[in-house]
């Protein structure tokens, strides 16, 4: 898994950072997990949220995770996460902790079997249609995240 993660990062660095462009690769970036946590905190721990964060804006520290628990200030979220170039897509639902390892393996296997083609198409669709934005404040500065739909604060669904 480590070799796959390194190959993935190298490919993204070439596609997104363009190391031949000045300063693009040297800018420090927050971890994707920090953006996830800060977004949930900024939204005051919503019942659910679904958003995209550009690969180019974060360090992908959650590589290989597809479905997992994410605790934030006493609340727990079930997070569905996938890389859908040029974004990382998150769907978070507040729910009690449970063992999500079988689903995590299942969703990861689906992505591998499908060669990532559906997630690539979803990412390109998101790139075309995600027009609602929000700024997430991180320890590395502001990060813009994208939504396909405007989310109503406090909505259950």
From Swiss-Prot:
Checking InterPro entries in the record gives:
DUF4528
Record's keyword annotation contains Kinase? no
On the tree of life, the source organism's domain of life is Eukaryota
Q: Which GO terms describe its cellular component?
A: extracellular region
Give the UniProt subcellular location, in the record's own words.
Answer: Secreted
Q: Where is the signal peptide?
A: 1-23
Asked if the record carries the keyword Ligase, the reply is no
Provide this UniProt record's keywords sorted from A to Z. Secreted, Signal
Q: What is its main location?
A: secreted
Q: Which Pfam families match?
A: DUF4528
Protein's UniProt name: Uncharacterized protein C15orf61 homolog
Q: Which organism is it from?
A: Mus musculus
């Amino acid at each position: 898994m480590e070799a796959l993660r390194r190959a993935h990062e190298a490919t993204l660095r070439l596609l997104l950072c363009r190391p031949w462009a000045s300063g693009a690769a040297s800018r420090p970036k927050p971890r994707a997990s920090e953006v996830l946590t800060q977004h949930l905190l900024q939204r005051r721990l919503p019942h659910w949220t679904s958003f995209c964060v550009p690969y180019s804006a974060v360090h992908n520290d959650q590589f290989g995770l597809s479905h997992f628990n994410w605790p934030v200030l006493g609340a727990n979220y079930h997070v569905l996460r996938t890389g859908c170039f040029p974004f990382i897509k998150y769907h978070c639902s507040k729910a009690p902790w449970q063992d999500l390892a079988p689903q995590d393996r299942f969703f990861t296997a689906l992505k591998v079997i499908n060669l990532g083609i559906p997630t690539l198409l979803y990412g390109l669709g998101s790139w075309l249609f995600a027009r609602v934005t929000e700024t997430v404040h991180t320890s590395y500065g502001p990060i813009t995240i994208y939504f396909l739909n405007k989310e109503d604060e406090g909505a259950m669904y």
